[in-house]
């Protein structure tokens, strides 16, 4: 009866894959089993592998790991460079001005002139009573409002009745408006809700910038084409202005020190005499 021999190759593979190095007792036992099961060429090849403990499967895995790590680091560097390039590019209305010139600014100002009055009319159409109620609710958020809204409504109606009575009394009298003192005018402004309406309308107007900028991007190309039909090209004029400014600001160094420079002719701009930015210019940049 033939008894099948169990091959030692699975045992050898387990030992070889678990440890990258093989100790001397394991070498003897494995070589003893190989004498019985493997042929002479296979035994010589396996012995050569066993006598070189420095070679392991982990080395190939480490090479793959480090190669993938290098690729990921290169990808992260390229991604950071692209993100830095995107951050340096202007966005919003400044990006549109860099692309279309002053035409984008004109379209944006026209949309602003339409948007702000519409917001004010929408707020003013609510009426003094509703505006006072909304203002009282806003004050309640910071703990300064009246908890009972009925009192607010009664106060508004009482002031309206008093104002109508004063206007009816002064209807028969010819009174010069210039005789009113500053305190009287300020009291009238405080009693009216025009200032509150204007502030609310301006807040709504600023929140609608997410609508104005896309509308500017949509309408600016057609506006540029319309101007070009009439022979007006604001982009060329803007480039000429910047070219003249750049030619006037040219300098050349006469030494290794960057602060030591010579003006390029009498048309060059004197850097030391440049005026600082005014508050109006800073406000305009913040508004854009």
Swiss-Prot record:
Its EC number is 2.3.1.-. Keywords: Acyltransferase, Cytoplasm, Transferase. One of its GO terms (molecular function) is acyltransferase activity. The keyword Cytoplasm applies. It comes from the Eukaryota. One of its GO terms (cellular component) is mitochondrion. The keyword Ribonucleoprotein does not apply. Heterooligomeric. Present with 1240 molecules/cell in log phase SD medium. Maybe involved in N-terminal acetylation of proteins. N-acetylation plays a role in normal eukaryotic translation and processing, protect against proteolytic degradation and protein turnover. PANTHER family: PROTEIN FAM210B, MITOCHONDRIAL. This is Putative N-terminal acetyltransferase 2. It comes from Saccharomyces cerevisiae (strain ATCC 204508 / S288c) (Baker's yeast). The gene is NAT2.
